[in-house]
Amino acid sequence: MALEMFYDDDADLSIIQGRKVGVIGYGSQGHAHSLSLRDSGVQVRVGLKQGSRSRPKVEEQGLDVDTPAEVAKWADVVMVLAPDTAQAEIFAGDIEPNLKPGDALFFGHGLNVHFGLIKPPADVAVAMVAPKGPGHLVRRQFVDGKGVPCLVAVEQDPRGDGLALALSYAKAIGGTRAGVIKTTFKDETETDLFGEQTVLCGGTEELVKAGFEVMVEAGYPAELAYFEVLHELKLIVDLMYEGGLARMYYSVSDTAEFGGYLSGPRVIDAGTKERMRDILREIQDGSFVHKLVADVEGGNKQLEELRRQNAEHPIEVVGKKLRDLMSWVDRPITETA
């Protein structure tokens, strides 16, 4: 089924220019949204807790900053870009008490709304504008007169203008220059979590560690194992990112291509796909989010223990040593003000 696409001519920038936008959070996406909204002629304020380390940066970049509660009280469009695990508390304590009929509540990711951790009042529009790229790229593309593709979704639309408002917001951050895809909170949330857990983060990490362990256990130097399964991964992913699987195989040697075709299905087989389906079901039925919330409420003990275990893996030890030799890595990303 083809998804509905929107571009510059489909969005009216004046809609969001006639609203007051409060951006809650100033991380990767928060800074990109706030600065680009401002540059598009939108009234914008940033909501951060007193004492937040990001406050001086916001002020240096010429934006107004106040507490989340005061920003929510001032705004009639509130974009929630705080971390997923902090959003429900911020909503309950700072945003919800200050929402007015006719306001709009926007999100950059649908998790909290889709799984019922945030339940907006019925007289407020609820929509999502989610750029498919990190904040520094969103901002850089905007400054260059281009844009990053976005997803938009409308979950609640009491006045019938939710989509037009979301598209206007997307235009203000450059999204309609590249293209905006209409989706749902359900589809965005579940596909995002599935991709992270089975491929992008969880699956890739475990594949890399397993390959490293097999080579080291077979007697090969850890340094060579690191180069072959982790360092060179970026080269392959960049090729896929630029032109798909065909571009990747076109660019590698015939030996690598032939070996990949033969051996890849032996590593990722029907059993792997079935376990991926199990993970998808756990996402869909809320089991994963239940575990996430329970860990947050328990002080993130499981997350901290898993982080500790990961940091102690031998691939991290040898990787640190090798990356110290590479002058082109581990440099901070430059933000475009």
Curated annotation (Swiss-Prot):
The activity regulation comment is: Inhibited by N-hydroxy-N-isopropyloxamate (IpOHA).
Q: Which residues form the KARI N-terminal Rossmann domain?
A: 3-183
Q: What is the catalytic activity of this protein?
A: (2R)-2,3-dihydroxy-3-methylbutanoate + NADP(+) = (2S)-2-acetolactate + NADPH + H(+); (2R,3R)-2,3-dihydroxy-3-methylpentanoate + NADP(+) = (S)-2-ethyl-2-hydroxy-3-oxobutanoate + NADPH + H(+)
Cofactor: bound how, per the entry note?
Binds 2 magnesium ions per subunit.
Query: What does the entry list as the binding residues for substrate?
Result: S253
Residues reported to bind Mg(2+) 2: D192, E228, E232
Cite the binding residues for NADP(+): Y26, G27, S28, Q29, K49, S52, S54, D84, T85, A86, Q87, G135
The alphabetical list of record keywords is: Amino-acid biosynthesis, Branched-chain amino acid biosynthesis, Magnesium, Metal-binding, NADP, Oxidoreductase
Named cofactor requirement(s) = Mg(2+)
Q: Record's InterPro entries?
A: 6-PGluconate_DH-like_C_sf, KARI, KARI_C, KARI_N, KARI_prok, NAD(P)-bd_dom_sf
- Chain residues that bind Mg(2+) 1: D192, E196
Q: Which GO terms describe its biological process?
A: isoleucine biosynthetic process; L-valine biosynthetic process
Record pathway: Amino-acid biosynthesis; L-isoleucine biosynthesis; L-isoleucine from 2-oxobutanoate: step 2/4; Amino-acid biosynthesis; L-valine biosynthesis; L-valine from pyruvate: step 2/4
GO cellular component annotations, sorted alphabetically?
Answer: cytosol; plasma membrane
Q: Name one Pfam family in it.
A: KARI_N
Instruction: Kindly list the GO molecular function terms attached to this UniProt entry.
Output: ketol-acid reductoisomerase activity; magnesium ion binding; NADP binding
Active site at: H109
**Where is each KARI C-terminal knotted domain found?**
184-329
Q: Does the keyword Magnesium apply?
A: yes
Gene3D superfamilies, A to Z: 6.10.240.10, NAD(P)-binding Rossmann-like Domain
**What name does this protein carry?**
Ketol-acid reductoisomerase (NADP(+))
Q: Which organism is it from?
A: Mycobacterium tuberculosis (strain ATCC 25618 / H37Rv)
Source gene?
Answer: ilvC
